[in-house]
Amino acid sequence: MSNMVPVMDKKAFLRSFLKRHQLKRRECAWLLNYLMNDDTLMERVHFLNHSEGTPKALVISAQGIEQIPFSFRKKHHVTTDCEKAFHDIRLNQTEDIYIELHFQERLTCPQYLAVLEDNPYLPETQERAQAFERKAEALLQESVRLFQLKKLSEAIDEALDNGDKETFMELSEQLNRLRKS
């Protein structure tokens, strides 16, 4: 249930973030600037509150936060070397990059909340997506059924107006079957 966040919004957020917050590791600002300057890469960037389970994640912290300064995780390998992360991103530009940022008041920052996405790899996100899909399917089926009921009623009225008893009986039978379903 990933929502598409425009590249323009992601870049605006990162610019604002880098102006307002001092990162624990300077190389992280360099890495974020590198991402920001490449629209193709920015299309693959996703900001998450929790990056657990994602295939490729950057965890970056600002000063004043009790979190590790930086970590890069790809599959089951974790490193705190920003340069390794840069080389992996540069060499694998078709892979999505999930970024978990830690900074003061992140849950009340409107620009951050505007680019924040659900982690598609967390079980509760998948369950929520499946529940949403089931509800959407049920709504669609009910809409189709109501449309069919309306069309059948209109056709029955037309058959009555035309005095067509055979069509009236046939359509009435269809209408009754549809109402029971």
Curated annotation (Swiss-Prot):
It holds the Pfam family UPF0302. Disulfide bonds: none annotated. Coiled coil: none annotated. Gene3D superfamilies: Uncharacterised family UPF0302, N-terminal domain, Virus Scaffolding Protein, Chain A. Belongs to the UPF0302 family. This is UPF0302 protein ABC1905. The lineage of its organism: Bacteria, Bacillati, Bacillota, Bacilli, Bacillales.
